[in-house]
Amino acid sequence: MTEESPEEDHGSPGVAETNPGSPSSKTNNNNNNNKEQDRFLPIANVGRIMKKVLPGNGKISKDAKETVQECVSEFISFVTGEASDKCQREKRKTINGDDIIWAITTLGFEDYVAPLKVYLCKYRDTEGEKVNSPKQQQQRQQQQQIQQQNHHNYQFQEQDQNNNNMSCTSYISHHHPSPFLPVDHQPFPNIAFSPKSLQKQFPQQHDNNIDSIHW
Amino acid sequence: MEENNGNNNHYLPQPSSSQLPPPPLYYQSMPLPSYSLPLPYSPQMRNYWIAQMGNATDVKHHAFPLTRIKKIMKSNPEVNMVTAEAPVLISKACEMLILDLTMRSWLHTVEGGRQTLKRSDTLTRSDISAATTRSFKFTFLGDVVPRDPSVVTDDPVLHPDGEVLPPGTVIGYPVFDCNGVYASPPQMQEWPAVPGDGEEAAGEIGGSSGGN
């Protein structure tokens, strides 16, 4: 999923993105041409959705699945073309979610619009939660292949700051004015005051978080 | 004809058929025969399933790979950039389209089995062709699915020339009044240029009888 680009997506034509959340499925398309396969959505996904609304004795022929595959691709091009025309009239270059909903409304699929708006609200709420929550942020970082390297650098700096602050905490616990002296300079008082050091680490870590955000 | 022999374990909950009138046949014949299979889907049931798509709680997993959707979107040379929301919305809309097409087509599967010797439990390409022919909003699929001339469209005003039945006869056809049970006609107010566009599109569709 391309969650790191909520505003624009400058994906290159030849670059394939990672979609860990998308279900992987085998395509039964007889044509092994890669370009031919890319013109349609996977036939297994299409068949699975068709079966949802058929009764237990219902069957689907292969040519029916292939026909629906073609209908879906035609639908995507149909909606995209309408949304693109709207953007051009408004001198915009990027098609967004509202343009898609507008196009679907204009092309006669009003029944789809209300559920799509509900779904879009949930999607945006999820994005907002991910940005605000540290835990979910880590999960998202694990899923983002492109952003992993950058985050790794940032995390490295963060760890470095943590170490420095821990050293500062040790010195502060001894009421020593100079924070640049080595730890082994006063080994016994350090051991004696370890409980206080642990207690004081929490507010220090809090300050550390603020400092990291500032960086 | 190759068939999909896999059985579907998820049985659709039965609609409240006692409250709905029995669906009419496409050819005038009285009295109506008794139905041995589940009733075809009503617009209420169709909208129910489409609405269920919007209630999906899992917005992280999508039914279709987004990269494939983006490739199809960008096959249009005029499309430059799209936000992350666009393929996500289109993926969900495609699910709704598939449900919509499947339920409308199954309607013809069941009815077709009674009119001919065709099996009434297997959805085929001709069922999809019949379903897309009768609804105006699927006009854009004319190049993908050939029109079924035996099916009467829901929009007599937009009926193409050269059809088996002339427009005047279609308007007065008794069965047409019953067809309203299945699908409501499109709202003319939302398409100011519908008559002209519809006629052009219908003409083009009529001319492409050799499609697929």
Curated annotation (Swiss-Prot), chain A:
Subcellular localization(s) per the UniProt record: Nucleus
Gene Ontology CC entries for this record: CCAAT-binding factor complex
KW Transcription (keyword) present: yes
Ranges of biased composition (kind: Low complexity): 136-151
Disulfide bonds: none
Pfam name, any one: CBFD_NFYB_HMF
Tissue-level expression: Expressed in flowers and green siliques.
Reported induction: Repressed by heat and dehydration stress.
GO BP field: response to heat; response to water deprivation
Keyword entries, A-Z: Activator, DNA-binding, Nucleus, Transcription, Transcription regulation
Free-text function comment from the UniProt entry: Component of the NF-Y/HAP transcription factor complex. The NF-Y complex stimulates the transcription of various genes by recognizing and binding to a CCAAT motif in promoters.
Subunit note: Heterotrimeric transcription factor composed of three components, NF-YA, NF-YB and NF-YC. NF-YB and NF-YC must interact and dimerize for NF-YA association and DNA binding. Binds directly with DPB3-1.
Family from the record: Belongs to the NFYB/HAP3 subunit family.
Protein's recorded name: Nuclear transcription factor Y subunit B-7
Organism of origin: Arabidopsis thaliana (Mouse-ear cress)
UniProtKB/Swiss-Prot annotation, chain B:
Region (Disordered) location: 1-23, 190-212
GO cellular component entries: nucleus
Domain of life (superkingdom): Eukaryota
Keyword Nucleus in record: yes
Function: Stimulates the transcription of various genes by recognizing and binding to a CCAAT motif in promoters.
Assembly, per entry: Heterotrimeric transcription factor composed of three components, NF-YA, NF-YB and NF-YC. NF-YB and NF-YC must interact and dimerize for NF-YA association and DNA binding.
Name of the protein this chain belongs to: Nuclear transcription factor Y subunit C-7
